Amino acid sequence: MVCGGFACSRNALCALNVVYMLVGFLLIGVAAWGKGLGVVSSIHIIGGVIAVGVFLLLIAVAGLVGAANHHQVLLFFYMIILGLVFIFQFGISCSCLAINRNTQADVINASWSVLSNSTRHELERSFDCCGLFNLTTLRLQDDTSCSAVCKTKSSTCQMCGERFLKHSDKALKILGGVGLFFSFTEILGVWLAMRFRNQKDPRANPSAFL
C-alpha cells in the first residue's frame, strides 16, 4: 500500500522532525567541539552553525506539534521558516567546505595576534606546541616564553599553527558535510508539511476543513 493517507503523512512528518532534532543536537555538538578548541572560535561560521542547530531544534518542535494536532497555521509558518533555514544552512555548509587552508591560516594568524599571553600559553600547553607559524613576528617571543611539555623534552617543538589547522580543517569538513546533507532533507520537510496540511483529517468535522 502506498503511503499516501493522512495517518501515514503525519507519521512521516513526525519522524522527519525527530531526525531534525537529532541533526540539531549533532550540529551544536560538533560545532561546540570545534569552538572548544580555542582556535576556531573566531571563525564566525562555527557560531552560525550553532545558531542553525538551535533554530532547527525549535523548528522541529513546532513541526511535531503542528503534525500531531494538524494545526493549519502552525504548519504554514513551519513550511515558510523551514525553507528559510534551508537557504541559510545550505550557504553556511558550502562556506565551511569552501574555506581552504590558506584562509584558515589567515584567520588563525589574526586570532593569535589579539590573544593575551596567558591564553597563548594555555593553548600551547593544551596542544603541546610552541609558537604559531615561522612567518609570524611573534614566533621568537612565543618560542622563548613557551611552557609546553615538549619544551622540556626537546629543544624544538611542533608549531601550534599546524595542529590548529589540522583540527580546524577536520571540524569545518564535518560541519559542512553534515549540514549540506541534511539541508536537502529540509526540502522534503517542506513538501511533507504542504501535503499533510492539505489533507483532510478523518477525525475532524468535515465542515471545519479549510
Swiss-Prot record:
Bilayer topology annotation: Multi-pass membrane protein
Positions on the Extracellular side per record topology: 34-44, 94-173
Protein family (similarity comment): Belongs to the tetraspanin (TM4SF) family.
GO cellular component, one term: membrane
Stated name of the protein: Tetraspanin-31
Organism name: Mus musculus
InterPro entries, sorted: Tetraspanin/Peripherin (IPR018499), Tetraspanin_animals (IPR000301)
Side Cytoplasmic, residues: 1-12, 66-72, 195-210
Predominant place of localization: membrane
Coiled coil feature spans: none
Keywords, sorted A to Z: Glycoprotein, Membrane, Transmembrane, Transmembrane helix
Subcellular location(s) per record: Membrane
Statement: the UniProt record of this protein carries the keyword Transmembrane helix: yes
Domain of life of the native organism: Eukaryota
Glycan-modified residues: N109, N117, N134
Regions that span the bilayer: 13-33, 45-65, 73-93, 174-194
Keyword Protein biosynthesis attached: no
